[in-house]
Amino acid sequence: YRYTEGVHELISPEVYNSKNFKPKIAVIDFGVKQNILRHLVNLNAEVNVFPENTSIEDINNFKPDGIFLSNGPGDPSATEIKCRKLLSALFQLKIPVFGICIGHQLIGLSFGAKTNKMSQGHRGANHHVKNIFKNKVEITSQNHGYQIDLDSLPNCLEVTHTSLFDNSIEGIRH
């Protein structure tokens, strides 16, 4: 379905709009929060939301400029097994794929990493995360009880962000 509702007030839209380019973002819905969709719309994106059991043909018909793997509940390993065919096809499209929460963990699993349940999940605001490339601390809001296992991370994935609370992986890139 197409999502068009933005947040009520956008402070400085000219910062985000580049020559009126309106990127088409395919959101794969694993339990996405509406506020995330609102922010994508406010960033001048054309947002189409697809269920996790969608076909790659449906996504291709939308002709996205990028894929967004949403947040959502549950064990990422179980979700990856259920969505393995779709995830594999998404990475063959050769367009940017971004994931948060379970979406981030699914990216790791898709490239061979493992996930495990955290002894203490990250819940709420004010989680300090180190941006490794900028060597800066960022304050984040989190809600996850699983993590990508660092020891299983394949060479094709690089850690970009780590938690300053427990050194867990908070960001990766391919």
Where do the PLM segments sit?
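Hydrophobic residues at beta-strand termini and immediately following loops
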Residues: 28, 50, 118, 162, ...
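RNA-binding accessory domains that recognize and position tRNA/RNA substrates
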Residues: 1-62, 74, 86
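Cysteine-nucleophile active-site neighborhood
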Residues: 66, 70-150
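Beta-strand-turn-beta hairpins that frame and shape the catalytic cleft
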Residues: 20-25, 134-137, 174
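Structured helix-beta-strand junction loops
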Residues: 43, 62, 93-94, 155
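A generic "binding-loop/recognition-motif" signal
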Residues: 32-33, 55, 102-103, 144, ...
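Catalytic beta-strand/loop cores that center a nucleophilic Ser/Cys/Thr
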Residues: 136-174
